[in-house]
């Protein structure tokens, strides 16, 4: 119950009281919601449920629980055993998981997943858009199939020596878990869809309602959340569609680190919606190869907290690391301890870092400076480089530098005489820096 003075909700801060913000009021009221999915949907009948969805539920439950006899039970018995049917009445969990399209549209229209695809982030109109208002046991496969089209979820081909991997832009385990979490944790009191915005390099999933009680960005990996739709979540867990409470987020972080992609980003989440973003780009191929070799050689795999620590060390972060994990990784020779309590990844990681090619008579520092020039100019001239290397190289040395870069193919000459300019061949240039 909100504490009010003259109709204004107040919150205690230290010794004093202050007026609560709309966001704080909304969060407190949201926390008082009962389990929506266990609530009876009075008008819903068994005939309103999708037979194919019920069969899928049976199959997945029997497989997950190793109970083949479950397949032979009558539908009503199954619905009752899973607490989707009580005293002849079906609840909203039954509607969300098993309801026919027309039933969902009629009784819970906000139970809808929208996917918008855009070719780039500056586009306001979408390139393609589709909606799925389906029983979840059927809809989740359709949603993933749409996201996973070859043109919108291409494989990233990476290789280093004998190692060759095809990594999807967006990992199936990660995206399915994120979508199912959005369905299970969303607030159904808010009349808005789950919206998935997909780009070639990024995918964002947003759902109504902020984080569940007690969860925030800082503790999302360490707190077991209480889902808003507990009955619904229990069935998703029993049928193997989602991980046990708290482990789904672990899975998303785990796969992102294993594929050396940026961590799941919840930074745009507020009290009214959860906003989760995944990036497609691989940050460090050497780290990906390193992690695959380490995990494949182990009987007991490193957990998500071990991986997070290795990822932080890769990024040069040495603060707030768990000393127990550090000691474990040190003993297993996955990290080395440097002077001043800093850490670095083991030499095995460094073996996967490709050696840069070199140009005789040209230093890497000179190439870095030339590269900086190209960041601000599409093409450069000899005079541009004379300014860049003023006081460092003579005119003759600059001419020699240009000649060697041109011979190696990393720059190309355009124009003649005083109008001569040089453009960069990035595919060749990047091998040297």
Residue ranges and their predicted role:
Residues 312-318, 374-381:
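Short capping segments at the starts of secondary-structure elements
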Residues 394-397:
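Short coil turns linking two alpha-helices in DNA-binding domains
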Residues 281-306, 346-373:
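Short alpha-helical segments that sit at the start of domains
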Residues 1-172, 176-291, 299-341, 400, ...:
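Conserved N-terminal catalytic/coupling substructures associated with nucleotide/phosphate chemistry
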Residues 339-364, 416-433:
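Short, cationic-aromatic polyanion-contact patches
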Residues 384-390:
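DNA-recognition alpha helix
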Residues 406-407, 422:
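C-terminal regulatory/interaction regions
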Residues 410-413:
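C-terminal interaction modules of eukaryotic adaptor/scaffold proteins
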């Amino acid at each position: 119950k909100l504490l009010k003075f003259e109709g204004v909700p107040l919150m205690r801060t230290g010794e004093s009281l202050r007026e609560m913000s709309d966001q704080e009021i909304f969060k407190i009221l949201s926390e008082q919601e009962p389990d929506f999915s266990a609530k009876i949907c009075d008008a819903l009948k068994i005939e309103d449920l999708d037979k194919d969805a019920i069969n899928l539920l049976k199959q997945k439950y029997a497989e997950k629980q190793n109970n083949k006899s479950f397949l032979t039970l009558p539908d009503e018995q199954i619905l009752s055993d899973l607490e989707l049917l009580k005293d002849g009445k079906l609840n909203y969990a039954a509607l969300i998981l098993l309801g026919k399209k027309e039933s969902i549209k009629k009784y819970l229209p906000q139970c809808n997943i929208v996917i918008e695809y855009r070719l780039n982030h500056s586009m306001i109109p979408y390139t393609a858009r589709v909606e799925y208002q389906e029983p979840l046991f059927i809809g989740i496969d359709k949603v993933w199939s749409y996201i996973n089209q070859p043109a919108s979820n291409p494989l990233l081909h990476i290789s280093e020596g004998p190692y060759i991997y095809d990594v999807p832009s967006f990992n199936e385990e990660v995206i399915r878990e994120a979508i199912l979490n959005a369905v299970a944790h969303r607030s159904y009191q808010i009349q808005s869809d789950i919206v998935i915005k997909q780009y070639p390099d990024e995918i964002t999933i947003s759902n109504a309602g902020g984080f569940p009680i007690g969860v925030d960005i800082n503790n999302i990996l360490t707190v077991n959340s209480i889902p808003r739709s507990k009955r619904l979540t229990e069935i998703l867990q029993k049928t193997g569609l989602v991980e046990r409470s708290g482990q789904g987020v672990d899975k998303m972080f785990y796969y992102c680190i294993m594929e050396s992609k940026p961590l799941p980003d919840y930074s745009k989440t507020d009290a009214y919606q959860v906003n989760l973003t995944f990036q497609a780009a691989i940050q460090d191929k050497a780290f990906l190869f390193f992690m695959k070799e380490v995990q494949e050689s182990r009987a007991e795999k490193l957990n998500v907290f071990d991986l997070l620590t290795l990822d932080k060390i890769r990024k040069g972060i040495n603060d707030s690391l768990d000393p127990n994990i550090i000691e474990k990784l040190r003993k297993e020779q996955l990290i080395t301890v440097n002077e001043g309590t800093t850490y670095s990844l083991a030499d095995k990681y460094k073996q996967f870092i490709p050696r840069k090619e070199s140009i005789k008579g040209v230093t890497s520092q000179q190439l870095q400076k030339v590269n900086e020039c190209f960041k601000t100019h599409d093409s450069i001239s000899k005079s541009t480089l004379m300014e860049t290397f003023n006081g460092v190289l003579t005119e003759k040395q600059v001419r020699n530098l240009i000649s060697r870069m041109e011979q190696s193919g990393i720059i190309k000459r355009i124009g003649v005489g005083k109008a001569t300019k040089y453009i960069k061949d990035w595919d060749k240039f990047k091998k040297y820096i």
